[in-house]
Amino acid sequence: MTLNPYAAADVSAKPQNEMEARALVRTASRLNALKENWPPKKEDLNTALELNRKLWAFFLSEVCDERNPLPHDIKQNIFNLAHFIFKHTFNIQAKPSASSLDVLININMNIARGLNEQSKFKAEQAAKSGGATA
């Protein structure tokens, strides 16, 4: 099994934020499946948590890149979220509980929702201006 967050995503001609949203939803779904079938095998829990951690490590590396055009406050928020997720993941591994997964699931789903709304907005703007979607 690969731990690449984008391995299963259809990356052909998809904007970055749509791929990121899809990866967040898939990771949240995986965590939710573990929560609904509690208690999971320790290996399955650790694999899902590691996948989520790697996804957030990717986001962290992206916002730390000087070439990233996001505003500083958004970069800082993502940076802080990533660190919170790393700490919370460690706490889950130390003391696993089904309810502790809710925080990670909710963060991923809310960020994915925002990314999808951004994609929709960009597509609508491009359609209004007669340009291609970005």
Describe each model-derived feature in a short phrase.
Residues 1-65, 69, 76-134:
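N-terminal intrinsically disordered, cationic/polar leader segments
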